[in-house]
């Protein structure tokens, strides 16, 4: 029986990538800086002390981080009791966004640029907004700028409730984000609007990676908070991913947990399970691992690392999240059978100590555990697509166009 358990720790970078200078991210190091702040006693909100992640250490994260940056994270040394193969990978996709990272992991790097809304104010062209307004029968939008999601709902949420005008905003990523109140605007209306925006972007050749629904609740700016009902309406993959190949060539199953299905536009997904919150995502993953049959991929994205702690530059929260995940990791490891593969990786960085609120261009860990495979150092992988190619080889699928087998 062959099964792959692929877990993406969203934004868990381990040191700036070779091309980080193109993104003004030289020196960024999501993992390393979290470890440093914990060691120095500067990440004690809701937790305390040095970062405690024994299971990640056992899988090789410390050794992988050292190979990525040339030095061990502060307070750690070489781990000799590692049970997994470990290495690190750099991205060849043009962007440092979720879609590019996940597609490249699945063997389809995004080599051409997405369309970006670069203007900080009046970010979306009036001609585009007018098309959306007419088709959606809206009276208008508010926002239309680069913004942090939590900041903009605090600033414009009350006006949105009064006017029923959706809040639209973007970032340095290729995204069109729409924030609406779940009660006063309606969750189904928000999803319908996002589908309309996705349709118009595609029709008029705006190569925008994602339209993101950002629902929130609360009665005033002191109470507004985003809910777990976020949805991503992604552009469809323009080549066959390894998850689609598994379904097509082996009649396999791909169980998508969290926002995975949205990232691939539902393509190559057999079953979509919506879970929210780090603990629940881990519980759902464990539940599906126990049920997984032959020729199955259980594919989980742990979004909280990115959305709750990375973008919000919350070092303590990120550290606490890593410790929570590590506490669930022992059970995950125990469920991996002789012919299974457990793969832990990330899609980009989002250093909570870095300037701004955006992603950071970083190397990502590649940790592969299987009781039936001899552990080794995987080296510096020159593309995330090596993960997709490794999965393709493991399931005896036809070769992917990018990447090399690591095993």
From Swiss-Prot:
<dbReference type="GO" id="GO:0008973">
    <property type="term" value="F:phosphopentomutase activity"/>
</dbReference>
<keyword id="KW-0464">Manganese</keyword>
<comment type="pathway">
    <text>Carbohydrate degradation; 2-deoxy-D-ribose 1-phosphate degradation; D-glyceraldehyde 3-phosphate and acetaldehyde from 2-deoxy-alpha-D-ribose 1-phosphate: step 1/2.</text>
</comment>
<keyword id="KW-0963">Cytoplasm</keyword>
<dbReference type="GO" id="GO:0009117">
    <property type="term" value="P:nucleotide metabolic process"/>
</dbReference>
<keyword id="KW-0413">Isomerase</keyword>
<comment type="function">
    <text>Isomerase that catalyzes the conversion of deoxy-ribose 1-phosphate (dRib-1-P) and ribose 1-phosphate (Rib-1-P) to deoxy-ribose 5-phosphate (dRib-5-P) and ribose 5-phosphate (Rib-5-P), respectively.</text>
</comment>
<comment type="similarity">
    <text>Belongs to the phosphopentomutase family.</text>
</comment>
<dbReference type="GO" id="GO:0030145">
    <property type="term" value="F:manganese ion binding"/>
</dbReference>
<feature type="binding site">
    <location>
        <position position="359"/>
    </location>
    <ligand>
        <name>Mn(2+) 2</name>
    </ligand>
</feature>
<protein>
    <recommendedName>
        <fullName>Phosphopentomutase</fullName>
        <ecNumber>5.4.2.7</ecNumber>
    </recommendedName>
</protein>
<dbReference type="InterPro" id="IPR006124">
    <property type="entry name" value="Metalloenzyme"/>
</dbReference>
<feature type="binding site">
    <location>
        <position position="10"/>
    </location>
    <ligand>
        <name>Mn(2+) 1</name>
    </ligand>
</feature>
<dbReference type="GO" id="GO:0000287">
    <property type="term" value="F:magnesium ion binding"/>
</dbReference>
<feature type="binding site">
    <location>
        <position position="311"/>
    </location>
    <ligand>
        <name>Mn(2+) 2</name>
    </ligand>
</feature>
<dbReference type="GO" id="GO:0006015">
    <property type="term" value="P:5-phosphoribose 1-diphosphate biosynthetic process"/>
</dbReference>
<dbReference type="Pfam" id="PF01676">
    <property type="entry name" value="Metalloenzyme"/>
</dbReference>
<feature type="binding site">
    <location>
        <position position="348"/>
    </location>
    <ligand>
        <name>Mn(2+) 1</name>
    </ligand>
</feature>
<dbReference type="GO" id="GO:0005829">
    <property type="term" value="C:cytosol"/>
</dbReference>
<keyword id="KW-0479">Metal-binding</keyword>
<dbReference type="InterPro" id="IPR017850">
    <property type="entry name" value="Alkaline_phosphatase_core_sf"/>
</dbReference>
<dbReference type="GO" id="GO:0043094">
    <property type="term" value="P:metabolic compound salvage"/>
</dbReference>
<feature type="binding site">
    <location>
        <position position="347"/>
    </location>
    <ligand>
        <name>Mn(2+) 1</name>
    </ligand>
</feature>
<dbReference type="InterPro" id="IPR024052">
    <property type="entry name" value="Phosphopentomutase_DeoB_cap_sf"/>
</dbReference>
<feature type="binding site">
    <location>
        <position position="306"/>
    </location>
    <ligand>
        <name>Mn(2+) 2</name>
    </ligand>
</feature>
<dbReference type="GO" id="GO:0006018">
    <property type="term" value="P:2-deoxyribose 1-phosphate catabolic process"/>
</dbReference>
<dbReference type="InterPro" id="IPR010045">
    <property type="entry name" value="DeoB"/>
</dbReference>
């Amino acid at each position: 029986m062959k099964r792959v358990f692929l877990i993406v720790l969203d934004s868990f970078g381990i040191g700036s990538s070779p091309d980080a200078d193109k993104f003004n991210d030289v020196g960024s190091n999501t993992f390393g800086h979290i470890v440093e702040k914990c060691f120095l006693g500067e990440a004690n909100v809701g937790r305390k002390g040095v970062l405690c992640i024994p299971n990640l250490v056992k899988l090789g994260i410390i050794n992988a981080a050292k190979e990525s940056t040339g030095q061990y994270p502060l307070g750690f040394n070489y781990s000799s009791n590692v049970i997994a193969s470990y290495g690190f990978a750099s991205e060849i996709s043009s962007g440092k966004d979720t879609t590019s990272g996940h597609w490249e992991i699945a063997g389809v790097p995004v080599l051409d640029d997405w369309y970006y809304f670069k203007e900080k104010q009046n970010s979306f062209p009036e001609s585009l907004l007018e098309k959306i307004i007419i088709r959606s029968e809206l009276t208008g939008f508010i926002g239309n700028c680069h913004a942090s999601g939590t900041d903009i709902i605090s600033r414009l949420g009350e006006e949105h409730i009064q006017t029923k005008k959706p809040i639209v905003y973007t970032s340095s990523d290729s995204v069109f984000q729409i924030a609406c109140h779940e009660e006063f605007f309606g969750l189904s209306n928000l999803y319908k609007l996002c589908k309309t925006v996705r349709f118009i972007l595609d029709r008029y050749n705006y190569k925008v990676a994602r339209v993101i629904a950002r629902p929130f609740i609360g009665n005033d700016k002191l109470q507004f908070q985003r809910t777990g009902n976020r949805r991503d309406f992604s552009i469809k993959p323009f080549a066959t991913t390894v998850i689609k190949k598994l379904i097509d060539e082996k009649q396999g199953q791909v169980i998508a947990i969290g926002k995975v299905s949205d990232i691939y536009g539902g393509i190559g997904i057999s079953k979509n399970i919506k879970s929210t919150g780090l603990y629940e995502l881990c519980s759902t993953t464990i539940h599906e691992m126990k049920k997984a049959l032959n020729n199955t991929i259980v594919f989980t994205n742990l979004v909280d690392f990115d959305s709750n702690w990375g973008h919000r530059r919350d070092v303590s929260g990120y550290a606490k999240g890593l410790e929570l995940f590590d506490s669930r990791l022992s059970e995950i490891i125990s469920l991996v059978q002789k012919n299974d593969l457990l793969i832990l990786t990330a899609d980009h960085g989002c250093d909570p100590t870095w300037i701004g609120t955006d992603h950071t261009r970083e190397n990502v860990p590649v940790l592969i555990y299987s009781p039936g495979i001899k552990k080794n150092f995987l080296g510096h992988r020159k593309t995330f697509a090596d993960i997709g190619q490794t999965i393709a080889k493991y399931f005896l699928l036809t070769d992917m166009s990018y990447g090399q087998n690591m095993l």
